């Protein structure tokens, strides 16, 4: 593994953004009834994995994957709230809290 450089973090950020975009496009595809939205979603997922592949060249896989997944989930929840008026119940908020705690624990390990 190469030494960490800021461009590794930039690729991780890009992977998160593309993951969020893919989830939003998937929702907008309405179960692939709008095929172009679905196809764009698949392209965004491929882009997210490609960016993650570049990020793990300088960030440990366990750290990069945990951050990618956690930030992707949290931002997708926020996007669902803002764009689609979706709300979490107390169990959902508890899950988000555990997710954040898990990110801290992995970073401390």
Swiss-Prot record:
A GO cellular component entry from the record: plasma membrane
Main location: membrane
Chain segments annotated as transmembrane: 6-26, 36-56, 63-83, 88-108
Subcellular location: Cell inner membrane
GO biological process: glycine betaine transport
Any GO molecular function: antiporter activity
Alphabetical list of InterPro entries matching this protein: Small_drug/metabolite_transptr, Small_multidrug_res, Spermidine_export_MdtI
Membrane-protein topology: Multi-pass membrane protein
UniProtKB keywords: Cell inner membrane, Cell membrane, Membrane, Transmembrane, Transmembrane helix, Transport
The protein's role, per its UniProt record: Catalyzes the excretion of spermidine.
Family: Belongs to the drug/metabolite transporter (DMT) superfamily. Small multidrug resistance (SMR) (TC 2.A.7.1) family. MdtI subfamily.
Name listed for the protein in its UniProt record: Spermidine export protein MdtI
Organism: Photorhabdus laumondii subsp. laumondii (strain DSM 15139 / CIP 105565 / TT01) (Photorhabdus luminescens subsp. laumondii)
């Amino acid at each position: 593994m190469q030494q960490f450089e800021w461009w590794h973090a930039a690729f991780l950020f890009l992977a998160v953004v593309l993951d969020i975009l893919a989830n939003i496009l998937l929702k907008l595809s309405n179960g692939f009834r709008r095929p172009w939205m679905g196809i764009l979603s698949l392209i965004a997922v491929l882009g997210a994995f490609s960016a993650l592949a570049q990020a793990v060249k300088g960030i440990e896989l366990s750290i990069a994957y945990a951050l990618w997944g956690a930030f992707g989930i949290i931002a997708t929840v926020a996007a669902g709230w803002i764009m689609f008026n979706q709300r979490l119940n107390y169990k959902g908020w508890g899950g988000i809290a555990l997710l954040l705690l898990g990110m801290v624990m992995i970073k401390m390990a």
